[in-house]
Amino acid sequence: MYISQLIAADAVHQVFSGRNLTLALPAALSLFPAATPQQKGAAADLSYGTLRFYGEIGAYLTQLMEKPLTDERIYALLLVAVYQLLHDKADSFTVVNQAVHAVSQLKRPTAKSWAKGLVNGILRNFLRQKDQLIHKLKMNEVAIYSYPQWWINKLKIQYPDHWQSMLETGNQHPPMTLRVNTQKISMTDYLQLLARQDIEATPIGAQAIILTKPQAVEKIPGFNDGIVSVQDYGAQLAAPLLDLKDKLKVLDACCAPGGKTGHILESANVAMTSLDSDESRLQRVQSNLDRLSLEANLVVGDASSTSWWDGVPFDRILADVPCTASGIVRRHVDIKWLRREADVASFVAQQAKILPSLWQMLAKGGKLLYVTCSVFYEENQGQVDKFLQQNADATQLPFALFTNDHYSQTNITHINGQLIPSTAHDGFFYALLQKN
C-alpha cells in the first residue's frame, strides 16, 4: 500500500505546485517503475480521491496540527492517508502503518524519526477524535462540500435552487458514456454486442450509452474500429444543435481533442475544418479521425484572429471556447484547487476576443453554436448577452434539448441552455446564434 500512497502523494504535491493532474500522475508513476498495475491503479484512485475531497481533508488536518506543516511532501502524504481513513475501505491501522513506512522511503531529510512520529501521531489522533472533528466542521462549507469558498458563493448566487446538487454532483465519480456511430451500427445491435461480452449498459439518448462499470477503451467492443467513441452525453448535444446538412462548410474552432469534430462528421457529409492553436493537440485530433475513418482539414491557428482564414465564410461554426471547465470538475478534480476567482474574468476576456473573430467568418444566415464546459454565468449567457448587444446582426435562437421517453435519463435539466450537472451528463452551456 505504501507504494501507492507515495505515488499519490507525489502527484498531489505536484498539483499544489501548479501542475494539472493529467500531467502530474504520469510523472509520479514514472518515479516508481517497479510498481505493479494494481499499485498504479490504486495510486490513481488515491490521487483523484484526495483532490476530490481536499477541502474536507485539509480542514481536518488544520485542526489536528498546531501549526502549518512546512514540508509539503509530508503534508501531501497526510492528505492521502486521511482520504483513505475517510473514504477508502482499507483497514485503518494498515493505512496508518503504511503511511509511516512511506515516510521512511522518502529520499529526503524528512525521512527521520520526527517525521515518522508526526505522521503516526496525527493519523492516530484523527482516528481517536474523528467524531469531535466532524462536529466542529459542521458549519464549515469548504469542509462540507470540498470546494473553495469563492466557488461555493458564486454558485449560491447564480443557482439558488441548484447550487447544493451541483456541488454534490461535482464530487461524484463521472460516468463512462459512449457515443454510438449509428451510421455503422444501430443502438439495439450495439447494446446486444455489449451484452454478449457481459458489459452492462443503459441507453440514455439517441446515440448515448452509459456503462455501468467503466472499461479500458481497448476493451470496449468496436472502439478501435470507430463504431463508438467515449464522450459525455452533454457534449453529444453539440452536433445535433448545429442543424447540419450535407455539403455545408463547417468550422470546429478550438477543436482538440476532436470528439465534437468526429460527431459532426458522423452526422452529415460536410466540408469540415478543425482549428486549434496547438499543433500537438491537432495530432491527437488526427489520431481520433483515423480511428473513425473520417477526414477533416486540420488547421493550426488562433480562433481570436482571422489571419489563418482564406476569406470563404462558413455555414456553421462550433465555438467550443476556452473556459474555467467548472462544469466538468468531477472529471478534472484538480480544477477546483488550481483555479482562482480571478481566472473567471481572464477566461471571459479571452472568450470576448474569440466570438467577434469567428463571427466575421460566418456566412449570412449561418449559425454559430457557442459552447463552454463551465457553469459560471459570466462565461455563458452573460458573455452571449454582451455579444448580442454589440452585434445587431446576431440573434439567439431558442432550442429544445432533446427528450425521448424511450430513454430513462434523457430529460435534461437546463436553464436557458445551461445544463445542470447530473449523474447522466456534465455541466455544458449552449447558445445558438444566427447571423441575420
Segment roles from a protein language model:
Residues 1-436:
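S-adenosylmethionine
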